[in-house]
A protein has these predicted regions:
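Acidic side chains
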Residues: 19-20, 44, 61, 207
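C-terminal juxtamembrane segment of a hydrophobic transmembrane alpha-helix
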Residues: 29-52
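N-terminal start-of-chain detector that recognizes signal peptides
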Residues: 27-28, 37-38, 170-176
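Membrane-embedded alpha-helical bundles that form the substrate/pore pathway
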Residues: 24-28, 44, 57
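Short, conserved structural patches
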Residues: 2-10, 57-208
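Glycine-centered recognition micro-motifs in short, flexible terminal segments and loops
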Residues: 9-34
Length: 208
């Protein structure tokens, strides 16, 4: 009789444990994809933020180098790319290489010119895509009391109006970035589009 009671108790215990195990498996199946999304998001956005900081640093340094060179080198546009623009390009290329970022062949690219603005464009190719747009405006005009930041994608001059106009050098660096987070989020039915590039812009007053 005691043995029969023991058997019934064990059988009842197993019946109670099985639903608990099933519930745990369901919870794990639901939480695992969310955990993966969370972890991928942390690493992806951290990498994007780090890249943003690096681009901000190099844009600032490149603008300072060009602004310190004589402005007279942009006076004769028929002589090719001014030395100040080349110096700025070298700063960007060296910084990317030193920080283990692919320069995508930036140093060998021939720029296009519009006025006193030179643009180096390398369309994104490969997996992950490698693409860079570098804009150097040696005659960036803005009002002395301006609180409007420069256009990070064009470096176009501002309109000073009746205010005193200042002239500086504007450098914009735009770097292709492949998000892993978007691919994982798509598994949850999300099709949100994220920026295809990270960019930074800086302005330095021309010194000469």
């Amino acid at each position: 009789m005691i043995r029969a009671a023991y058997v019934r108790t064990c059988s009842l215990g197993r019946q109670l444990v099985r639903p608990d195990r099933a519930a745990q498996l369901v919870e794990f199946a639901v939480s695992l994809p969310l955990l993966v999304l969370f972890v991928v998001g942390i690493f992806d956005f951290s990498a994007a933020f780090t890249l943003k900081q690096k681009l901000t640093n190099v844009a600032r340094d490149a603008a300072r180098v060009a602004a310190a060179d004589p402005s007279a080198d942009v006076g004769n546009l028929s002589s090719g790319v001014p030395s100040s623009v080349i110096d700025s390009l070298k700063v960007v290329d060296s910084y990317l290489t030193a920080n283990r970022l692919n320069d995508c062949g930036l140093s060998t690219k021939t720029p296009t010119r519009s006025g006193v603005t030179w643009t180096y464009t390398i369309a994104p190719t490969g997996t992950p895509p490698c693409g860079i747009t570098l804009i150097i405006n040696r005659g960036y005009v803005f009002p002395v009391t301006s609180t409007t930041p420069p256009d990070a994608r064009t470096c176009l001059s501002q309109t000073p109006g009746s205010q005193t106009a200042l002239v500086g050098t504007c450098v914009s660096v735009q770097y292709a970035y492949a998000w892993k987070f978007a691919r994982v989020a798509s598994l949850f039915g999300r099709n949100d589009s994220l920026p295809t590039e990270i960019f930074a812009v800086a302005v330095a007053l021309n010194e000469n």
